[in-house]
Amino acid sequence: MSLPAHTGRRKYLIIARVGDNSLHASWLEPKEFRNFDLCLCYYGDHPGRYGGGCDYDLKDEGSKWSAIKQIVKRLGDDLFQYEAIWCPDESLQTDAFNINRMFHIFTDQALWLAQPALSADSDCSRRETVQHPEYILRYT
């Protein structure tokens, strides 16, 4: 698995392990709000399936976190050119506007670690991970 050099086009990076039912295509719209590079590590049966919509198109075996570990190792110092990195699950339904907003809050608040809240209709086991309409940001 090799990665091309960082293009410097965008401030943020999303690294996602994706299969044939990934929802990541919604992350790229509307295009005018896309402020991130997208690195997809595909584990399905159709190599190159998502190559057109991402900046880094990889195929690798193994679990989500072992694949992300390999990507991080290969990107090396190029990771430091990004202001923030997000490693979402492929099953998250969102769009470029909300991702842009998430990254803006992250950098505006100088956070070192963060995650977006889930919508009220999400399948989750922890109540504190669900959106609360009165908050922009919560510390836990």
Each language-model region and where it sits:
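Generic hydrophobic/packing signal
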Residues: 17-18, 90, 112-115
